[in-house]
Amino acid sequence: MSELVEKILSGRFTRTALLTMRENAIARLKKNPKDERALEVKEVIDTTQVPKLMKEYVFMGFMPGADIDRAIDDKWYSEGVCTFDFYEDSNQTEDFYRILPGDIVITKKMLIASGEMEIYAFGYVTECVDSPNSNKRWLKVDWKHPKEFMRVPLMGCTRTVNPKSLEMVEEKMPPEFWDWLR
């Protein structure tokens, strides 16, 4: 195990540094798919939980086109995954690729008229997977299902992928939200 990998595993790097290292490893693998060091760095970052204070809360829409008949949350829950297929939006794609193991994904539906959203389930990202077949990323998620959904402030979560820092979530969410996450 290299010194770099040991530092990654010990939590010595910031979230930004981890994402930069991951991007660099991917760039090296494009040039040389057998680069063992790049493979090892990418694998460790894709499977190692970020430190608690670096976690992000990702409020994730699950109804393509806001159409309830196209909802995919049940598939996510049963398969232990989270996917994203709106690659035409480069900002959301970038946000989806910033998700790391240890982050919390929360399924949500916007209620624009009230300035709220309904949240249904949450899960801890356990691994990030870049599919060589589809050239798309998906997440392995350990989903939890609270007994009831909850209405919370919208917090600007108007897109499919809405990452929020711990500080923002602490500032905006009611105390009941933290009970719901248990």
Q: Where do the PLM segments sit?
A:
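Amphipathic alpha-helical interaction surfaces
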Residues: 31, 51, 108-111, 125-128
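Compositionally biased, charged N-terminal/linker segments
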Residues: 2-6, 31, 37-99, 171, ...
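Short coil-to-beta transition motif at edge beta-strands of beta-rich domains
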Residues: 94-112
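Aromatic- and Lys/Arg-enriched surface recognition patch
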Residues: 116-182
